[in-house]
Structures are given as C-alpha cells and as structure tokens.
Amino acid sequence: MINTSHRSQSTFQPSVARGASPQETVTNKVDLFDPAQPPDPLRQAFDGITNAGGVAKAQLLQENQSAWNARWKLVEGAKDSITAQYFCWDHDALGMALLGHMFKKARNEEVQIRLMVDSTGDTFGTRGFKSHIGGKDYLQEVVMTGNAEAKVYHPHWKKVIDQALAIGSTAISANNHDKILEVDGNRGITGGRNIGYEYFVHPDDFKGAWRDQDIYFEGKETAHALRRAFDVEYGAPWITQKVRGDLLGNWVQRDLELLGAYKMMDLWLKDKPLSMEEKQHLRSSEDGRKGEARHLMDRALAALPDEGLERAASRRERKSLLKLAEELVGYTELRGSYNATAPDMHDAEVKIIDKTSSVGIGTDELNSTLWNLAGAAQKSIYIENPYVVLSEDMIQGLRQAGERGVQIVLGTNSPASTDSAVTQAFFLRDWPRLSATIPNLTILCASGNRKLHAKTAVIDEQATLVTTYNLDFISQHTNSEVGSVTWSKEFAKETVDGFNQDQADPLNGVVEYKILRDEQGKPIRRDGLPVLDEKGDLVNEPEVLFGPANHLTPDMLSQYQKKVHRWDFLRKILPQLNPVDTFRKH
C-alpha cells in the first residue's frame, strides 16, 4: 500500500527493467556470472538458497476469487496425489466444499491424499475439523476411503505436556502456520490464505473480506521442495496426532454431505455469472437467497448418482446441505468465476524456504534467508505484513539497509483494520521508535473495512517473497512457517502494482504514520531535546505528526494502552508469555 499524499518521494514505483528479461534469467544464467560485471549481491543471496526449487511458471494470486478458483482447479486436475496443510480450515461452505472435493478424488479416483490441520487454528474445536464438536466426522469419512490420511498438529494435550516438561519454553505457542497445497509433485500454492470464506469472497459480498496474497506455481523442483516442507512436520509423530475412523466404522455417514458440498460449489463456480440486478436481489432478499439455495441443493443432489452415490438424502443431510447452500449463494461474485480471466503466468525461478516449529526438528531456512535477502538490498525493500512486532535483530537488519540508502516501505494494519489486538498494542508502542531509528522508512497503515493479511516483500524490484510469515516473535521463533522467493522482474512488478492498487482502494483507507523531521529528514522535537544520539540510537521519544490519535477514537486508544500495560505486567511475572500472541486467524 502506497500513500503519496503525505510524502511524494516515498512512492514505490518499479524502474525500467535492466539486463536480462525474466525468460533470459531462467534459461540462460551466463550473463549473471560475467567477470566484467560487478557481482549482484541479491542474485548471490538468491543463489545461496540451495535444494529448494528451480525453474517454474509463477502466478500471483491477489484477487480472492482467483485464489479460490486456482485451488479448485488444482485439486480438480490431481491425478496421483494431494498434500494439504492449513493453519485454519473452517467447516463453512468453502471449507466443506474443498474437503468434499478431496473426498471425491480419494473415493472415486483413488488419488492419494494427506491432510493436516493445526490444533490452535481450530482452538476450541468448534469451527474446523479437529474434534467431534466441530467436523471431525467429515475428516474421518475422507480417511476411511482407504486412500487418505489426516493428522492434527500439536493437539492441546500435547502442548500442555510439552510445556510442563520445559517450563519457560515456547511449546504452548508452537503451531503449524504453514499453508500448503501441492499436487502430483509438479504444482502447488502457498501464501497467506487459510481455508475460510473471509479469504476468498469479494468485498461487495462481505465488507470485511481479507486482502491477502498467494503464489501458484508449476515446476517439479519447486513442488518437491513444498512437499518436503509438508513432510518434515507431518512425519513427526511426537507432535502430530493421526485421525482414525471410529472403532466400528463412521457411526454417522458424511459421504453425501461431502459430495453434496463439493457439487454445489462446482455448480456455483461454473454457472453463468449473475447480472448486477441478480446480485443485488440475492444480497438484499432473504427469500431470494433461500429460494436460490434450495434450487442449488436440489441440482447438486440430482447430480450425485453421477458421482457414484445413489441413496436419497436424509432429513439431517438435507438440512446440513441447505445451510451450506444458503451461505454459498450469498457469495454472488463467486458465481461463474471459474472461467474468468486468470492472472498472468510468468517465467521465473521459484524457491521454497521453510522453518519448523519450536517443538519440531529445528529446521530454519526461512529466517536466515530473509536476513540474507534484506542484507543484499541495494535500492528498495517493500514489505506488506499484517502483524508487526519487530525483534531487535529485525530492527537492526532494516536499520542497516536504510543506512545504505535503501528505501523501505512498510505496509500493515492499524487498530481499525486488525484482528490481532495484542500485536497492534505493541505496534502502537513501537512505531515511533521504528520511524526514528530506521533511515528511509515509510510506515503506511490500513484503516478501512478490509483487513490486510498478505505477507509479502519485494526487494530491488527483482526478488519477491510470498510467505506465511508474520513480522512477530511467534513466526520468528515458535511457529512452523513456509514461503516462496521468486526471481522475476515481471512477477515483482505485478506485486508492486498490487501494492499501489491497495493504496488507491478506499476500502483500505491507507494513512501514513509520521514523526516530526527537519528538512534533511532527521528526527527532531519542538522542545529542542535530541531524538537520536550520535550512533543513531533513540534517546528521547519522537514527536508524532500523524499517528493513531489522528484517526482512532479516544476509547480505542485507551483500550490499547491498557492492553500494553497488562501484557507488560504479565510478561514480567510469566516470561513464557513473551511469545504468546492472539489465537485468532493468523
């Protein structure tokens, strides 16, 4: 997100591409090592990511409907295998449909499937598939096809034991935050999106729809690297719990509901798009939605014999499907979106960077790669991240880049758009210090209806990161995280274009947080006290020109101040709480 109204020189625009085209970069690397040319530090840092991917086709998934259809088509085209891991996998209309799609692939086509969900992503077991309170029966139905396996990552009872065995550790907050969908060893998707309606519906259908970002790729080396990131956590029996069928079979059959949810979604995506009048009717008329939902459900049930399911739906099953259908028909922009123009596909190199959780085997390729790439930046670093509580090493890394003259733009949430009160409380406390001590830093915050959830960065208009990684302690030290690094000027440009579109979108309400500076850009105060010492360290609080107090209510500011005091007190008496963040949808 870019805001040019406050400081025009901070606008992040890609320069004219220099040197090889993305295609030449992929197919002919000789020019990269020409001794007559000075070495490119960023390319050297990228080449230092070993055994993690290679030549691929890459597609940036910015729009929510495109991201959903990419997943639908990926599963639809699976011939041999599917691996999937999501921090959150809700049993709403979208989550049930995707699980039903995989059930169909396992049951009817004998595609081998492995699924994993995180226990904290479904904290109380009511919204996902980890427990019988929620939807474990459906996960069991998939497993009982004989062609699927499923696991729950770090169940709460294991968390309690691990924490008791290691007092003061981060075991209580060690989650699998990965978002992985990989098919047939040659295609995959990763990025910020979980499986739930907020991530895939249009803002016209739900004002609070998330703004997120994923990458779809085609390439064997990259797909195998993403699968390895799945395997390293899936294959750890001391952290995971296998999902098994009930002792005497699944006592309540869920096959018809799963296939019905799949078929309703498939029909809805492939139907003729709705006219504007039809959309408005469904959005405004409850009777209209109920009528459309019954029609959609009846069409799906009539098609189930073609999927090998001949029996009639029971009253319970019809009630369950009708509820899903009534939700689905409210997402009017999804209707007919299957055949919409897809985002551009780019020739690129795509590498996967992985990190296991703090109770895993200790693999961490992600943090070191992030620092190496940031350390190699010569011109610009653009970051979009929803939760910003920077550690000291993160701050120092960005500070060193800024001191080299690198322009740094950080886009994140404000309290008006966030879902994480805890991280925002600390960001509100920290941002003036970041602005004062990191040279060439611009801080832009969303303050509108949409929640920013993208976890991306573009470095020197060439290397693009699309990850699951939040800029906080949890992601850095405790969670399992995964991400991609894409080498392509075209892919980087498209990402930057998306940032600029975010700035212009009134739903985001982007504002720039600023401190008082002199004409040379040095932080100053009106009372004459210095802000920084000779080393560039903070000695007095900066003076805020525009910040939270300029766009938040006094009540909201007071609530956040209380949160900071409360957490600072708790962290003093309970050091193990230092990494604990909100257990909302990250």
Predicted regions and their residues:
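C-terminal low-complexity, acidic/polar tails when present
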Residues: 273, 277, 282, 296-301, ...
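Non-Sec secretion/translocation targeting segments of pathogen effectors
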Residues: 1-27
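Long, C-terminal catalytic modules of enzymes
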Residues: 244, 445-586
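Long, well-ordered mid-to-C-terminal structural blocks that present hydrophobic/aromatic surfaces
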Residues: 370-372, 376-418
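HKD-type phospholipase D/PLD-like phosphodiesterase module
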Residues: 39-41, 46-81, 88-375, 413-462, ...
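N-terminal carbohydrate-binding accessory modules
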Residues: 22-45
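Sec/Tat-exported extracytoplasmic proteins
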Residues: 79, 86, 109, 146, ...
